[in-house]
A protein has these predicted regions:
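Short coil turns that delineate tetratricopeptide repeat
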Residues: 54, 70, 104, 138-139
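Canonical tetratricopeptide repeat
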Residues: 61-64, 74, 78, 112, ...
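Short coil/linker segments at helix-helix boundaries
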Residues: 57-70, 153-187
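N-terminal leader/linker segments that initiate helical-solenoid repeat arrays
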Residues: 18-74
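Conserved structural position within tetratricopeptide repeats
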Residues: 51, 98-101, 131-135
Length: 187
């Protein structure tokens, strides 16, 4: 029984050891491809490494990748997409912000960053980003949908508050009714 237990423990721990070695090997391949100028191959290896261990891949990005190189934005995009797919919106937002520092008027990056802000519950920041997107590209569908929904829901909440406050009055005067109607017309 004891040998059987040892056998199973060693059998199940073997993939962890192999995984650690393969992540290091893949990261070495990424470095070699970057040094050789094979950016497409480097991104492919990087994507495979993300699938193996996203945390070590992120550490590699922060420690080994030159942030001024052209490939750094491609690698940051891969990490942002992976974190978004894993629903780690804070880290995805971090990498989209990293991309925005390089190209602050890139509509795609702004849109992805605003989407992450919505997922993180930061609607006010997302609102500002979507407004900036509309300044850059007036017919952006995602920005128009978000802003339309946001302003509509805000107006609905204000209308509900006005109606609730008006209904609290047992016998409203003409002046109170006029204020109520004026408040509704402003919405």
């Amino acid at each position: 029984m004891r040998t059987l237990t040892i056998f199973f423990i060693s059998l199940f721990s073997l993939p962890l050891v192999l995984n650690a070695q393969s992540v290091d090997e893949m990261l070495q391949k990424v470095s070699a491809a970057i040094e050789a100028g094979q950016n497409g191959q480097a991104v492919s290896y990087f994507r495979q490494t993300i699938a193996l261990n996203i945390d070590r891949t992120e550490m590699y990005y922060w420690t080994n990748v030159d942030k001024n190189s052209e490939i750094s934005s491609k690698l940051a995009t891969e990490l942002a997409l992976a974190y978004k797919e894993n629903r780690n919106y804070d880290k995805a937002y971090l990498f989209y912000k990293e991309l925005l520092q390089k190209t602050p008027n890139n509509v795609d990056c702004l849109e992805a960053c605003a989407e992450m802000q919505v997922c993180r519950g930061q609607e006010k920041d997302a609102l500002r980003m979507y407004e900036k997107i509309l300044q850059l590209e007036a017919d952006n569908l995602a920005a128009n949908i978000f802003l339309g929904n946001y302003y509509y829901l805000t107006a609905e909440q204000e209308k509900k508050k006005l109606e609730t406050d008006y209904k609290k009055l047992s016998s409203p005067t003409k002046m109170q009714y006029a204020r109520y109607r004026d408040g509704l017309s402003k919405l």
